[in-house]
Every structure is written in structure tokens, then in C-alpha cells.
Amino acid sequence: MDFESFTLLAATDDLGVEPAARVDADGLELRMDFADEPLAQLDAYDGDLPILVTNRPTWEGGEAADTAGRLDALETALEHDAVTAVDLELAALEGAGDHDAGRVADAARDRGASVVVSTHNFESTPDREAIVSRLERACAHGDVGKMASTAQSPDDVLAMLGATRELTAEGEQVATMCMGAAGRHSRAVAPVYGSRIGYAPVDPADATAPGQYDLATLRTLVGQLQSDA
């Protein structure tokens, strides 16, 4: 996955959804921190869709313990041919935790995999200038800078969309979205402004973040909006 155009990922903790996801998704995001035996799942995987692996630590809203094993698992996952991208937290790459996330980024590049550098705010959305600054830092570490924040108002969504458009115009690859009810529509609208990645579960009951649409709905909405743009 090179993310040169919009890529819709089916977010899941179970690679068994691949046949159903194939209808609407361009790839899968395997949430290793939510999954049972994620490395065994990768060993058994014979699907067609490429995979982005995420092993989110508890301090960034996930369920993985902040141990060297979290990064070791990502590095092992990258040995699988189907894994063509990895998500690493901006804070980890800038020194949060006691372990070297940079080695995973290096391993990904050695294998020709893309690096998505992510940052999250589960409480609020900063102003546009702060969003741009955060995403620029993320882009400096990886191929795509990803930011998800919680919107409390339409103004928060406008700040995120404005930052997305600004950075896209500068040639950066970013993936952006606002979480929560006030920001839900951003998941469909942000690709029109340049966001390169969307995330959605096949089944809405399996959402991995607040405000996610199900996969088929998001594919339809994005397709309609992009065709009108």
C-alpha cells in the first residue's frame, strides 16, 4: 500500500473477515492489540487484501502493554508478505515509552512497507495551526501522517479539514478524521480534502474508534462525494 490515492481499510481484529471486506475495502487494518493470536492469524492468512498492522499501546487508546514485545510483534508481522504497511505512534517515535519504535520503521522500509505515523486526541481537537504542526512532525517520520481527534463542534471539523487541505496542497500524505458524533461526517468528507486513508469495520458492532461508519456505508459515501468533487 503506497497511499498515493484514497485507501479504505477494513479495521478488524480478525483476518477471517477478509472475504466479506474484499467487496468494499482496499486493504485491512489488523488491530493486533485487540486480536487473539494476531501472529498466528497472519501465519494462516491467505486472503487477497494487503494488511496494515497496528499494535496500539494503552497510552494511545489501545490495549497493548508498553513493552518491547509490542514492537517485536510488529517487526515479526512485517515478515509476512501480506503486510505492506505498519502504524507507529508519533509519540513512540519521538521517545515516549522505553523502547525504540524507530527500529520498526527501519524494518518496514527495508521490506518496502509503508509507515503510517499516527497521533490521537480523545478529548478535543486543537486549532488548525496545531493540527498542521502535529501532522508535519508525523510526516517527517513516515510516509503518511495520521491524526484523529475528538470533535466537540463543527468548528473542530473545519480545523481538521483545513489542515488536511493545506498539507495535501504542500505535497504531504495525511490521513485525518474527527471522532465522536460531532465529527462523524468527517470520515466521509475528509478524503475530498486529501485524506489518504479511511477506516471502517465490516460490521458496525465491531467499530474500533468512536463514530466509525460501517465499511459498505463509508465506501458509498466517499464514492459519492469524490464523484461530485
Curated annotation (Swiss-Prot):
<dbReference type="GO" id="GO:0046279">
    <property type="term" value="P:3,4-dihydroxybenzoate biosynthetic process"/>
</dbReference>
<keyword id="KW-0704">Schiff base</keyword>
<keyword id="KW-0057">Aromatic amino acid biosynthesis</keyword>
<feature type="binding site">
    <location>
        <position position="212"/>
    </location>
    <ligand>
        <name>3-dehydroquinate</name>
    </ligand>
</feature>
<comment type="function">
    <text>Involved in the third step of the chorismate pathway, which leads to the biosynthesis of aromatic amino acids. Catalyzes the cis-dehydration of 3-dehydroquinate (DHQ) and introduces the first double bond of the aromatic ring to yield 3-dehydroshikimate.</text>
</comment>
<comment type="subunit">
    <text>Homodimer.</text>
</comment>
<keyword id="KW-0028">Amino-acid biosynthesis</keyword>
<keyword id="KW-0456">Lyase</keyword>
<dbReference type="Pfam" id="PF01487">
    <property type="entry name" value="DHquinase_I"/>
</dbReference>
<dbReference type="GO" id="GO:0009423">
    <property type="term" value="P:chorismate biosynthetic process"/>
</dbReference>
<dbReference type="InterPro" id="IPR050146">
    <property type="entry name" value="Type-I_3-dehydroquinase"/>
</dbReference>
<feature type="active site" description="Schiff-base intermediate with substrate">
    <location>
        <position position="146"/>
    </location>
</feature>
<comment type="similarity">
    <text>Belongs to the type-I 3-dehydroquinase family.</text>
</comment>
<dbReference type="InterPro" id="IPR001381">
    <property type="entry name" value="DHquinase_I"/>
</dbReference>
<comment type="pathway">
    <text>Metabolic intermediate biosynthesis; chorismate biosynthesis; chorismate from D-erythrose 4-phosphate and phosphoenolpyruvate: step 3/7.</text>
</comment>
<feature type="active site" description="Proton donor/acceptor">
    <location>
        <position position="120"/>
    </location>
</feature>
<feature type="binding site">
    <location>
        <position position="208"/>
    </location>
    <ligand>
        <name>3-dehydroquinate</name>
    </ligand>
</feature>
<feature type="binding site">
    <location>
        <position position="56"/>
    </location>
    <ligand>
        <name>3-dehydroquinate</name>
    </ligand>
</feature>
<dbReference type="GO" id="GO:0009073">
    <property type="term" value="P:aromatic amino acid family biosynthetic process"/>
</dbReference>
<protein>
    <recommendedName>
        <fullName>3-dehydroquinate dehydratase</fullName>
        <ecNumber>4.2.1.10</ecNumber>
    </recommendedName>
</protein>
<feature type="binding site">
    <location>
        <begin position="29"/>
        <end position="31"/>
    </location>
    <ligand>
        <name>3-dehydroquinate</name>
    </ligand>
</feature>
<feature type="binding site">
    <location>
        <position position="187"/>
    </location>
    <ligand>
        <name>3-dehydroquinate</name>
    </ligand>
</feature>
<dbReference type="GO" id="GO:0003855">
    <property type="term" value="F:3-dehydroquinate dehydratase activity"/>
</dbReference>
<dbReference type="InterPro" id="IPR013785">
    <property type="entry name" value="Aldolase_TIM"/>
</dbReference>
<dbReference type="GO" id="GO:0008652">
    <property type="term" value="P:amino acid biosynthetic process"/>
</dbReference>
